[in-house]
UniProtKB/Swiss-Prot annotation:
This is 3-methyl-2-oxobutanoate hydroxymethyltransferase. 3-methyl-2-oxobutanoate binds at residues 43-44, 82, 111. Keywords: Cytoplasm, Magnesium, Metal-binding, Pantothenate biosynthesis, Transferase. Belongs to the PanB family. Catalyzes the reversible reaction in which hydroxymethyl group from 5,10-methylenetetrahydrofolate is transferred onto alpha-ketoisovalerate to form ketopantoate. GO terms for biological process: pantothenate biosynthetic process.
Length: 263
């Protein structure tokens, strides 16, 4: 996928969209050589790469730094960058400063969380030529307001609010919307109501696509496995095993051998 038109094309053809998070050049090169459709440089890097407990502790400069690294390795993959917490709550001038940083880093689009208070910005960005992906349901930047990482849209009132927000984002010009941790039935209803594609994470099978955190699906975060995550590799133990083997071979003088030495 190379443009936002490919997102709409996939939805119209009922072809699922695969999106994965990525935060660095080395992994981006692997993703570039895979069948994955698009990359999200998520503000989840605050937790995954920097060890913070939430996504709140990341700046636009940090997002731009990681976005640039990913873009250098991503080949022709479509790259979306998150706008970090509070970067789009300071008026249009400050908003555009954050957007400019990640777009100049090479992102093809930006993602922002929520709809209330953001619709004017979405319209402004779209009118300025910046593609925007929305994000509804569990919005990690609002974790304190939401009372933690919880499923959203359980009751009828909340479901109606999320559906209305999705329609508002579409009307404002968003090319896609992420639905995170919402009941499958609600995600199905929203997907059917929208002309733009939905990307689910913990939102059931009926979304137009799916996204996972790369390190989660590779099984690298031992002891952390939300219900919506499927692991495709025991990455933690595989990598640990390689490190232990390296240590053992160094300790016993198996490595380096003559093969890895110069004459």
């Amino acid at each position: 996928m190379k443009t936002i038109l490919d997102f709409h094309d996939k939805k119209s053809k009922k072809q699922k969209i695969s999106m994965i998070t990525c935060y660095d050049y080395s992994f981006a090169r692997i993703v570039a050589d895979s069948d994955i459709d698009c990359i999200l440089v998520g503000d989840s890097l605050a937790m995954v790469m920097l060890g913070h407990s939430t996504t709140l502790d990341v700046s636009a400069s940090v997002m731009a730094h990681h976005t640039a690294a990913v873009v250098r390795g991503a080949g022709d993959k479509f790259v979306i960058a998150d706008l970090p917490f509070m970067s789009y709550r300071k008026g249009l001038t400050a908003n555009m400063t954050a957007v400019e940083k990640v777009m100049k880093a090479g992102a093809h689009a930006v993602k922002l969380e929520g709809a209330a208070g953001n619709l004017k910005l979405v319209r402004h960005l779209v009118d300025s030529g910046v593609p925007v992906m929305g994000h509804l349901g569990l919005t990690p930047q609002s974790v304190n307001q939401l009372g933690g990482f919880k499923v959203q849209g359980r009751d009828e009132k909340a479901q109606k609010k999320i559906l209305e927000a999705a329609l508002q984002l579409q009307d404002a010009g968003a090319f896609s919307v992420v639905l995170e941790c919402v009941p499958s039935k609600l995600a199905k209803e929203i997907t059917a109501a929208l002309e733009i594609p939905t990307i689910g994470i913990g939102a059931g099978v009926d979304c137009d696509g799916q996204v996972l955190v790369l390190q989660d699906m590779l099984g690298m975060n031992q002891g952390f496995k939300p219900k919506f995550v499927k692991t495709y590799l025991d990455g933690f133990n595989t990598i640990k095993g390689a490190l232990n083997q390296y240590h053992q071979e160094v300790s016993t003088e198996i490595f380096p051998s003559e093969k890895e030495s110069y004459s």
